[in-house]
Amino acid sequence: MVESKNTELSQGTWLNKPKSVFQEAGKVTLETDEKTDFWRETFYGFTRDSGHFLGVETGSAFTAQVRVQGSYESLYDQAGIMVRIDDGHWLKAGIEISDGHAMLSSVLTNGKSDWSTAVYGGNARDFWLRVTVEKGVLRIQVSSDKKTWPLVRLAPFPTSDHYLVGPMACTPERGGLKVTFSEWSLTAPLGKALHDLS
């Protein structure tokens, strides 16, 4: 179960709160600071934990969902959702600029980071993300209309009695990415079959 007293974004805790951020009921609008990122070691050799993350504490199993509206421009501009245990165990997923295109991107970190990208056929400037964690499995889904939710990634994920989950944004090469997060929900796991896209 969610096992959380406070499931609203307003009850979240910032990791690296951006200098420019506005929070109102059910909505967070921010502008990223210079050279912010989440990454651990792989390929590049560096570790960065400077990205913006608004984490809402939850229990051992949950489904979280959020709408993401962003004005991506430069290499590695990214915004989406993050699930985090600590600085060495986390997942971030969303839209990221790579090779001149807005890609559907996910990074799973278990000591070291991996990175997976795919072409996104919807509107990269306005989309929804859903993440479910239950019994050591993490499932990410994306939607362009909040009705159909194809799978982005299914992966093992460390079990924990609690997680932090919420909006994430980074700009490793610059600052100034403007993003609005809204339509946030945090509930018990939806319990849908893997190929149930509703």
Curated annotation (Swiss-Prot):
Keywords: Cytoplasm. One of its GO terms (cellular component) is cytoplasm. Pfam families: DUF1349. Its main location: cytoplasm. Signal peptide: none annotated. The keyword Cytoplasm applies. Induction: By calcium shortage, copper deficiency (via MAC1) and the presence of galactose (via GAL4). It is found in: Cytoplasm. The keyword Cytoplasm applies. InterPro entries: ConA-like_dom_sf, DUF1349, UCP022704. Present with 721 molecules/cell in log phase SD medium. Functions in the galactose metabolic pathway via the GAL83 protein and that it may control the level of ENO1. This is Regulation of enolase protein 1. The gene is REE1.
